[in-house]
Design a protein with these regions (language model features):
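Beta-propeller-forming repeat regions
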Residues: 2-6, 11-287
Length: 287
């Protein structure tokens, strides 16, 4: 086998000092490439609930999950069976992994059957929210979501999906509780769960100016999400989760203090006179 090559960060000066706390080892054959290949543990193909699907690596973020000064990778696995919010149909299960840069799998979160898979649904944030030097993960969850240690959020027996193939709601989740959960970066253990703000109702209240278009009653507009991290008080980070891309947009800001998610404020453009009403956008920018 080819010997590994170790690379270190050094400080320039009269007496260079090697920073032995941060290093990266590459195979000799890889040292000339301008990137680091990180092996992933791809989930097995699934045949369940009448669905067959495989997984592919999707959105990713980085954060120092264990406080050692090095980044870890947090990766969303996208099933091949996904849907956009307006379309009926069942989806596969949405998974989120955490890896070290050498490919060690730290944990896997399974969001469960009550979180639909698709680009518009799961927005996850990775950031050190409480200032302890370790990043947390925050995302929307539901009954049956399972954390990185095997703990189940909510009621594991509940299946809130519409299972009638003839219904315009087929495969959609327009009933049941919705949650916002924060997970420990080192283990993937859920630290706190709160009721998601806002809820999805009324289903026909998200299109048109002020959400009064009454042009969608099947969750196509109610189930579109964005999210970001913002220093709202200029000192500590908050998370902002947004629901609605069209007529009505609701932004909910949360702080994570002493192990608890705490609502900071909620902005709602549901009034037609609101200048932010009807300002359709599929993205969130924070500056």
């Amino acid at each position: 086998p080819e010997p590994a090559q170790a690379y270190y960060v050094t400080y320039s000066g009269e007496t260079p000092i090697r920073d032995s706390g941060n290093s990266s080892k590459l195979r000799a054959s890889q040292a000339n490439t301008p990137y680091l290949s990180v092996p992933l543990q791809k989930p097995e193909a699934v045949s369940s609930d009448g669905l067959s699907y495989t997984y592919s690596a999707n959105d990713a973020s980085v954060g120092d999950l264990d406080g050692d000064g090095s980044y870890e990778i947090i990766l969303k696995w996208q099933p091949s069976k996904v849907q956009n919010p307006p379309r009926p149909g069942l989806t596969g299960l949405q998974l989120i992994d955490a890896y070290t840069l050498d490919g060690t799998l730290l944990w896997r979160i399974n969001l469960g059957k009550n979180i639909r898979a698709g680009a518009a649904y799961t927005q996850f944030l990775v950031y050190d929210l409480d200032g302890d030097g370790k990043a947390e993960l925050v995302c929307k969850t539901a009954d049956g979501s399972t954390d990185g240690t095997g703990n189940v959020i909510g009621d594991a027996t509940k299946d809130w999906r519409n299972l009638d193939p003839k219904s315009p709601f087929y495969g959609k989740i327009v009933k049941g509780p919705e949650y916002l959960s924060v997970f420990e970066g080192t283990t993937g253990k859920v630290l706190d769960t709160q009721i998601y703000i806002p809820n999805r109702y009324p289903l026909d209240g998200w299109g048109g100016i002020g959400g009064n278009g009454n042009n969608d009653a099947t969750g196509g507009r109610a189930d579109r999400f964005t999210a970001g991290v913002a220093y709202l008080n200029g000192k500590k980070p908050s998370v902002v989760f947004v629901r609605g891309w069209y007529g009505r947009t609701v932004a909910a800001a949360w702080d994570f203090n002493k192990g608890k998610l705490q609502s900071r404020w909620v902005f709602d453009s549901k009034d037609a006179e609101n200048p932010f009403s009807g300002q359709a956008n599929h993205q969130l920018s924070i500056g």
